[in-house]
Amino acid sequence: ALGELPVKRAIIDGGITPYQLPYLIRKLLLARDMLSFKLAVNNRKILEAAFPPERFTLPGHDPKKEYDAIEAYLKTYSDQTIRNIFWSGNNYVLPKTPAKIGTKITYWYGDEEKKDRRSNIRFIKHYFPQARIHGIPKMAHAELVMIYPEEFCRYFDKFMCR
């Protein structure tokens, strides 16, 4: 955003932009996010409802084993780590206006997360008016890169190598 590093092309993949809300509201959202995370970690049904195993398990992998491993790993997060993840993801500072740059920017999001990305898309359009907004059909957040890495690479190559 400062223009200190020359960048010809940039992909913002489902990027979370800073909240444009009062501090107290941001703290309440942090509490909601932490509670949601802890509920998913401590209740397998909630975790699987949020990320259905049949959709988020790589082909050839056992969904039960995968989700057992995810569940065990997520339980290692301390409350402070969870707090830091959510707070830093939503509450960082950018310059009031970005540097005047010639960077080609695209913002990717999964079509199935469009409602969740509405404020992020609005922010990107305002902050980087030259950005191209691109919805990825039939995808949820992070699904393209996690489950379809070859397709992710095709999108990447198409944007970076044109």
Where are these regions (language model features)?
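Short beta-strand/loop motif that positions the catalytic acidic residue
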Residues: 101, 107-109
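Flexible "cap/lid" loop of the alpha/beta hydrolase fold
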Residues: 2, 6-39
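Short, conserved loop/helix-junction motifs that constitute active-site signature segments
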Residues: 97-102, 126-128
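C-terminal alpha-helix
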Residues: 154-162
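Catalytic histidine-centered segment of alpha/beta-hydrolase-like enzymes
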Residues: 136-153
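Conserved alpha/beta-hydrolase catalytic His-Asp/Glu region
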Residues: 21-22, 43-99
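Conserved alpha/beta-hydrolase "acid-adjacent" motif
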Residues: 114-120
